[in-house]
Amino acid sequence: MKLFPGLLFCSLVLGVSGQWYSFVSEAAQGAWDMWRAYSDMREANYKNSDKYFHARGNYDAAQRGPGGAWAAKVISDARENSQRITDLLRFGDSGHGAEDSKADQAANEWGRSGKDPNHFRPAGLPDKY
């Protein structure tokens, strides 16, 4: 009689453990996707391409699964919030005001929702990206 509850308990623990590992793995891979998009944006240094790279990083991360989508949201929100703080300290000197932040967040959400990031791709951006 005690064998069945023991097996049930172990299977539940192992099942949750497997899901947790999958989520963490997806989150790590999603964070890497976000970093790769950021690195590509810096390397490309192409005018009006930031929304594309925001959408692409979020899209790639979200394709990993729930963990990737979570990582993309956390990283995107942290980036935008840190920009707001630096804008306050620099009195808007960075050129990333509230309007730009809202547009960035819209591109982030566009990508996370699975929509094509090429919607934001500027004309002339090299095919490498």
From Swiss-Prot:
| Chief location bin | secreted
Q: Where is this region: Disordered?
A: 92-129
GO cellular component entries = high-density lipoprotein particle
Which keywords does the record carry? Acute phase, Amyloid, HDL, Pyrrolidone carboxylic acid, Secreted, Signal
Report which superkingdom the organism of origin falls in.
Eukaryota
**Record PTM Pyrrolidone carboxylic acid, positions in chain:** Q19
| Annotated compartments | Secreted
Q: Which disease is it linked to?
A: Reactive, secondary amyloidosis is characterized by the extracellular accumulation in various tissues of the SAA protein. These deposits are highly insoluble and resistant to proteolysis; they disrupt tissue structure and compromise function.
The name under which this protein is listed is Serum amyloid A protein
Q: What is the species of this protein?
A: Canis lupus familiaris
